[in-house]
Amino acid sequence: MMGCLPFFSVETWILLLTFICFFVIYSNRPYGIFEKLGIPGPKPYIYWGTVGRHHKVYYEDDVQSAKKYGKVWGTYEFRTPVLAVTDPEMLKTILVKECFTYFTNRRNFHLNGELYDAVSIAEDDEWRRIRNILTPSFTSGRIKEMFSVMKNISGKLTASMRSKAHNNEVIAVKDIFGPYSIDVMASCAFSLDVDSINNPSSPIIDHASKLFRFPVPVLILQGFFPILLPLFERLGVTMFSKTSTDFFKNVLEKIREERSGSSNPGDVLQNMINSQTKGNDSYSHKPNHKRLTDHEILSQAIMFMFAGYETSTTTLVFLAYNLATNPEVMKRLQEEIDSTFPDKGAVRYEALMQMEYLDCVVNESLRLYPPAARLDRIAKETVKICGITIQKDMVVMIPVYALQRDPELWPEPEEFRPDRFSKQNKQSIKPYAYMPFGVGPRNCLGMRFAQVMVKLALVDILQNYSFSVCEETEIPLEMDYKGFVGPLNPIKLKLETR
Ligand SMILES: *[C@@H]1O[C@H](CO)[C@@H](O)[C@H](O)[C@H]1NC(C)=O
Ligand SMILES: *[C@@H]1O[C@H](CO)[C@@H](O)[C@H](O)[C@H]1NC(C)=O
Ligand SMILES: *[C@@H]1O[C@H](CO)[C@@H](O)[C@H](O)[C@H]1NC(C)=O
Ligand SMILES: *[C@@H]1O[C@H](CO)[C@@H](O)[C@H](O)[C@H]1NC(C)=O
């Protein structure tokens, strides 16, 4: 017998068998926890868990699971037990009532590289301190101050569309909205004039879109062997692209150097820097309750770019798609635009924010396509909520995409119907059925900012142009299975001059 296996010594065999034993024993450990708790859900495969059981697109998978298992179910993301919840009473408790006590933190993959202290990743007191300092940068007063900057960029956007409409070009809508988002974010965050609308090859777009493209092998490896996370971390493995993070770090450091003293633009970066001098009672590299360290400022600024770019862009892309495929909605919206700003007049902030139908259209588009398909929280302690025990350290996941397409909450959920949000119908929307920006103290900080920049671009464009479907338009859309909610292939439409 041993003669057939000449290459392996006894020691090698022992090692190999030990490894196989470890592999098998380790594999089964996390599974069965939901069965014990009496929570339904798909049966896991070892190591792989229940990933992609019903559909390869993870958020479509959530829709199928919700149909099958109801409002609470258990899944295993590779080896990690994840409790999915769409029950409104539980959502209220998790996201709002017990946010500060049991559910303060998001799931942390620990491979955050430089961004470990970004507000979306920071935990507990750290998070609360950073969030409190950032909040004033996103009040409606501050956003109103940024409006003229946004308008300038939106003006460039519409100007760049003129020739495209004139030549009857087929456009990949992301190619126009991506540069718009980048330019708005860079201007409002750092007063940086990128003008990527007119210089589409600018490296900043490339880096901004790269950051959230998590490397799949790392995702799978950390999923299979979460106990190796500290090792990966020490080896410098990160989910966020290091070249892209470094790119923004250099840009920002240069801006800060140039901005010594005299100039004081009202951008997000300056608001953070100003908070440093306000809380001036010890060294600036030491955190205190009133201010951010230099590193923290850097992380917030980078996170703002990255979190804002992709989400605002896809929101605009889906709006264009929904309007092109629902021309009667677009017509009604254009009527509202024309009566609010007669004779293609300049868009004003207050009037824009008061447009009712526009708000319904944007909300309905975000209902069907919320950029973040899932939210999550970690339970700090074992806690019983609405009769369901949630164990310490368990991931609670809110499948927003599935929630917002739940046929019990949204009749004919696949239909694009802005009137769901009209004054008359709004009352029938159940609380906690709609959360494209999350809810509670840990909701999206940039919500109002995003709403303004999205509405402005949409109104400016629809004043002079209409979107229309063409042969190249994919209907229905095939969805992307990586990252944020998005189309697998670029959405292509045509522009018509009004
Ligand atoms: C935007 O602002 C720049 C100066 O900051 C100006 O030259 C340009 O004409 C403006 N563009 C639009 C479309 O308002
Ligand atoms: C802190 O305040 C002192 C005076 O009280 C001032 O000299 C110093 O420049 C301030 N430091 C910072 C970082 O603003
Ligand atoms: C649209 O959604 C936002 C938040 O997502 C909300 O504040 C607003 O009231 C909604 N508008 C309507 C008309 O429902
Ligand atoms: C829309 O068209 C009118 C003339 O038809 C023009 O004056 C205006 O600048 C255009 N607006 C935009 C945002 O392109």
Question: Model-derived features: where do they sit?
Answer:
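Cytochrome P450 heme-binding "Cys pocket" and the immediately downstream C-terminal segment
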Residues: P327-V329, M447-F484
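Cytochrome P450 heme-thiolate monooxygenase catalytic core
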Residues: I33, F103-L115, A122, E145-T314, ...
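Cytochrome P450 heme-thiolate "Cys pocket" and heme-binding signature region
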Residues: I302, A307, C386, K423-V454, ...
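Conserved cytochrome P450 K-helix/beta-meander segment immediately N-terminal to the heme-binding cysteine loop
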Residues: I398-N425
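C-terminal helix/juxtamembrane-tail motif
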Residues: M1-P6, N274, G483-R498
